[in-house]
Amino acid sequence: LNRCFGIDLNHRFNPAHRLAKQWVEEGRLGHLLFINMAMWIMNPRESSPYFQLKALHPHTVDIMRYFCGDIEAVQCFATKAPGRKIWSTAQFNMRFVNGVVGSLTGSYDIARGHPMERCEVAGTGGRFVIEDIFKQVTLYPAGSLEKIVYTEPSLFGGMRDFVDTFRDRIKRFVQQVDEGVAPEDIDGSGADGLAAQKVLAAAIESLETETVVRVG
């Protein structure tokens, strides 16, 4: 049908993630080696045993793919916090098609108050860390005692809160549709959303079978 889909993968739609992506594309991290991703909030709702995996981690997996490419294999362990009936906290190990290795930790058991999200990507030339979605991004060049720190709001145009990530995501989608971008080239396309879901399906299978599962 040649339709454009703009999936609401809003967590990476902000200037901090775009700057970090620019560093990767410029080669400032060198050959990519690993990625560590974490996200946690308090969500007491109980539904599917895999609610936390399915609802929270399309965002985290999308961020990991944004920086490091497609994921080919997943291993997942999970636990239930006191009083929980669902798998409310999970740990993933991942291998990417390009050889990068990664870890992802997620939880519905920790109340917000301090930063809820962290992404670290490292390569032979250095690493970066994004704190709390868009609040701060730091570049650590390898072999250097110096670091480069960008802190919101001084650099990032006054992003006030999490709601601004939705505005950024919608603005980007409207801009690309207006420019006539092909469906497959949409940033946060339907294909990107499906790719994240395939990773999570493999993670659920891994949790059930206690094996490493290849992403279908």
Model region roles, listed by residue range:
Residues 22-26, 51-54, 91-93, 121, ...:
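Short, hinge-like loop/turn segments at secondary-structure boundaries
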Residues 48-54, 156-164:
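A short glycine-threonine-serine/GTX helix/turn-capping micro-motif
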Residues 4, 172-216:
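C-terminal helix-rich "cap/oligomerization" subdomain common to oxidoreductases
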Residues 8-16, 39-75, 87-88, 192:
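Mid-domain beta-loop-alpha active-site segment that forms a flexible
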Residues 55, 59-138, 163-182:
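Contiguous beta-strand/loop segments that form the cofactor/metal-binding neighborhood of enzyme cores
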Residues 19-22, 63, 91, 172, ...:
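Alpha-helical elements of Rossmann-like donor-binding domains used by nucleotide-donor carbohydrate transfer enzymes
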Residues 1-44:
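A contiguous active-site-proximal alpha/beta segment in oxidoreductase catalytic domains
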